[in-house]
């Protein structure tokens, strides 16, 4: 679901001359009198056209310049020019048309293509010399350059690029452009590491490994950690193996992982997310959950519901892995203060946490 995906091709308005004369009411978005019905709601032509253009645009919406309730007055919008509040009023009224994502095969194809682009960037690119950590929270894409052939990444470098390319990937999702700048920051900070864990596990799983590693089987931990420290081997192995082994046990398919990752990145229960942000993400997550359930029901028939629950439980395994990684970072900083990653890597870690 990349930014700039066009809106539904179905007709924007459906009405008859008789209904025009017998059913005139206020537009549920702006309050104007109208007899039209757009995107599943009683709404005027202007609001229907606005929503269609907004869904088709790749541009981020500017934050509301006022109090965030420009379209709360039902009888008339307070600040009609505020695109941000207008869009979210459309969402509140159920006008966000996600029907184009209900075609399972097409949705999986889009997610697969999008994920493939992200993985290519991860494997072949690096940040430019002038890179600054705050770029990650900007609405624009992160500036990346081709990785020189002589540049060999260590575990810190791969971990850094994994985070950078995943944050860039998340900013390109369709719904990201509808979030306020504050919600976008909260979304990126709280969501990206779940994706880091999932994507790292998937790459290793697809390589027929039973442990998590970076490309070329580079360990996810620095050599100084694996050579023997006060960081327990049991903790290291839980991080490396728990999620990958569960993927192996379940024999998770490519399609299932794509949809599970989508459910994870559209999580509406992010702390500090506004009500508008929660409503928006919930709309998208419902689409992904329905798609995964449909896939499971088709592929596993009577066992579809239990398969669906088994896959969702993987997100709890991700959470446990994340908790273990937090413990590891604390121990690594305490026991090996001289082996920390480069300054730009540390800047990113501090900035996004």
Curated annotation (Swiss-Prot):
All residue ranges annotated as the NR LBD domain in the record: 119-351
Main location, first listed in the record: nucleus
UniProt DNA-binding residue ranges: 24-102
An example Gene Ontology CC term for this record: nucleus
InterPro entries to which the protein is assigned, alphabetical: NHR-like_dom_sf (IPR035500), Nucl_hrmn_rcpt_lig-bd (IPR000536), Znf_hrmn_rcpt (IPR001628), Znf_NHR/GATA (IPR013088)
This protein's UniProt keywords: DNA-binding, Metal-binding, Nucleus, Receptor, Transcription, Transcription regulation, Zinc, Zinc-finger
Zinc finger (NR C4-type) boundaries: 27-47, 64-85
Knockout mutant characteristics: RNAi-mediated knockdown in a Rieske iron-sulfur protein isp-1 mutant background reduces life-span extension, causes a mild reduction in fertility, and reduces induction of expression of glutathione S-transferase gst-4.
Cellular compartments annotated: Nucleus
GO biological process: determination of adult lifespan
Function: Ligand-activated transcription factor. Involved in lifespan extension in a manner dependent upon mitochondrial function.
Protein name: Nuclear hormone receptor family member nhr-27
Source species of the chain: Caenorhabditis elegans
Gene responsible for this protein: nhr-27
């Amino acid at each position: 679901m990349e930014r700039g995906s066009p809106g539904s091709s179905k007709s924007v308005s459906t009405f008859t001359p008789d209904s025009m004369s017998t059913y005139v009411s206020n537009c549920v978005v702006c309050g104007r009198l109208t007899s039209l019905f757009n995107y599943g709601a009683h709404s005027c032509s202007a609001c229907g056209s606005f929503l269609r253009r907004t869904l088709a645009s790749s541009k981020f919406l500017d934050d509301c310049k006022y109090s965030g309730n420009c379209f709360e007055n039902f009888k008339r919008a307070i600040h009609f020019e505020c695109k941000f509040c207008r869009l979210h009023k459309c969402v509140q009224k159920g006008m966000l048309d996600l029907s184009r994502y209900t075609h399972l095969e097409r949705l999986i194809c889009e997610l697969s293509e999008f994920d493939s682009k992200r993985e290519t960037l991860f494997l072949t690119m690096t940040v430019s010399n002038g890179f600054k950590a705050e770029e990650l929270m900007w609405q624009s894409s992160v500036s990346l350059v081709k990785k020189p052939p002589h540049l060999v990444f260590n575990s810190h470098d791969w971990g850094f690029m994994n985070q950078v390319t995943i944050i860039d990937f998340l900013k390109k999702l369709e719904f990201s452009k509808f979030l306020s700048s504050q919600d976008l920051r909260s979304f990126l900070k709280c969501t990206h590491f779940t994706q880091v864990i999932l994507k790292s596990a998937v790459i290793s799983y697809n390589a027929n490994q039973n442990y998590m590693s970076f490309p070329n089987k580079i360990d996810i931990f620095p050599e100084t950690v694996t050579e023997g420290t006060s960081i327990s081997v049991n903790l290291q192995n839980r991080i490396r193996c728990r999620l990958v082994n569960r993927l192996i046990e379940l024999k998770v398919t490519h399609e299932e992982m794509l949809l599970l990752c989508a459910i994870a990145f559209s999580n509406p229960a992010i702390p500090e997310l506004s009500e508008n942000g929660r409503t928006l993400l919930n709309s998208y997550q419902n689409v992904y959950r329905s798609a995964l359930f449909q896939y499971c029901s088709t592929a596993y028939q009577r066992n579809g519901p239990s398969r669906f629950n088994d896959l969702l439980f993987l997100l709890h395994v991700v959470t446990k892995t994340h908790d273990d990684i937090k413990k590891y970072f604390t121990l690594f900083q305490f026991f090996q203060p001289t082996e920390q990653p480069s300054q730009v890597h540390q800047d990113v870690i501090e900035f996004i946490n």
